[in-house]
Amino acid sequence: MLLPQPKSTAKKPKGEAKSLVARERKSQPQDSALMEVPAKREMPKKEVKKIRSVHKVESVTKTKSAKLRRKKSYSLSSDNESKYKKSISPAASEEASIEKKKEEMTSKLPEKSVAMKTANSPKTFNMELAKKFFEMRMKESQRTSRMATKSDSSLETMPESSHNSGQSSKSRKSQRTRGKSTPLDRNIFKENGEPVWVVPDRKPGELVMNEHGEMVKYPELMAALEEDGLEMEDGKGWFQKMSSYLMGELDQGRIDNKAASKDINPFASMETLEERTDLYFSRETVIYNTTDSIFNLCHNAIERFSQQNNEDTIRKSVPPSREPGSKMMTVSKDEEEKTAIVTSIRFDARAYRISYDRRRPVHSIQKFRKKYQKQLKKSQEEKKDDTKTAKNEGD
C-alpha cells in the first residue's frame, strides 16, 4: 500500500483530475495492483461575525447543525468510496515519484509469481510455495497408503485360485503326507483266518474244561446263565419234556395270560411286583412256555417225522405228470356235424401305436380318437366283406 503526499489547498479544475485518473489506470502494470487513499480537501476559512440579535443567533445555530450533518455524510461517502471504488489520482507533479515506487515493487516480486486480480481485492499467487505444499501432501498420502498395506498383509486371507494353479505337481505331492495304512488282513482277520469278533481261539465244537471240572462247548454262555440263576441243558433232553407236556405233567407252570393281563398294575407296591417276577421267571413256568412254543411252531414237522418212522402208514402215491398235448378231447358226433372244416386261419398282426404329447394333451387325445374311429370303420367293413364271401361260398 502506498500513501501519497497531502495535496495543496489550492483548487484545481475537474477536467485535470479525470485525465490523471485515466493516465494512471493505463500506466499501472498487470502484475500488481495499488490502493490509493484520497486526501481530505480543506475548505477556505470564513470570517465569523459576532451576532448580537436573538433571531440571528437561532439562524446561525441551525446553519451550523446543517453543516455538521453534511460533513458526516460526506465522510461516510468518502469511506465507502475508498472501500469499493478507486479513489481520484494525486496531482500531476507527484506522478514521477509514484511511477518509480511502482517499478521498485515490481522488481522485488519473484519471477514465477502470478498476479490474481479480482474486482474487490487483488492478490498474488506464489508458485514455489504451492509446489512445496502439494509435494508434502503427496508424501503424506503415500505414507498412509503404505501403512494400510502393511496392516492388511498381517490379516489371514484365502489365497486365490491363480496362486494355487502355479504350484508344480511335485510340490503338491511332497505336501501330502499320508500315514502308513495297515492291510485289511491284519485289521479284520487273525493269523488263523478267523475274524476278530470270534473271541475263543478254538475250533467249533471243541470241548473246554469248565470251572466246575465239566467239559462244555460254550463256557462264556454258561457263565452268563449262572449269573442270572439259570442252567444250560442239553437239547436231547427236551424230547422227554415234550412227552411230559403232552401228558399234562408240566401244567404246574401254566399261567392264564388273560387273567394275568387283567390284574397287571404297574403302580403297585414293590412286594407285589417282585412276587409277579418270581412267578413268571420261575423254572417251572420257563419250561412250560418253551415246550408250548416248540409244540405250536413245530407241530407240522413233528407229524411228518412221525409218519416216516411208522412203517404201517403208506405214502400217498402222486400221479405221474402228463403233458398238456397228450390229453384227448372227447367230441360228440353232433358237434362234429355242425362245425365246418377249418381251411384257412388269419392272424391280425397290425401294430397300433398311440402317441401322447404332454405339452399338448388335448390335441393328442383328439388325434387318438380320430385314428380309433377310422380303424373301427375299416374293421367293420372288412367283417361285412368276409360274411358276404362266406355266404356266397355256402350257396
Swiss-Prot record:
It comes from the Eukaryota. Residues 144-164 have a biased composition (Polar residues). Residues 1-121, 136-187, 308-335, 365-395 are annotated as: Disordered. Residues 13-28, 97-111, 378-395 have a biased composition (Basic and acidic residues). Residues 64-73, 170-179, 365-377 have a biased composition (Basic residues). This is Uncharacterized protein C09F5.7. The lineage of its organism: Eukaryota, Metazoa, Ecdysozoa, Nematoda, Chromadorea.
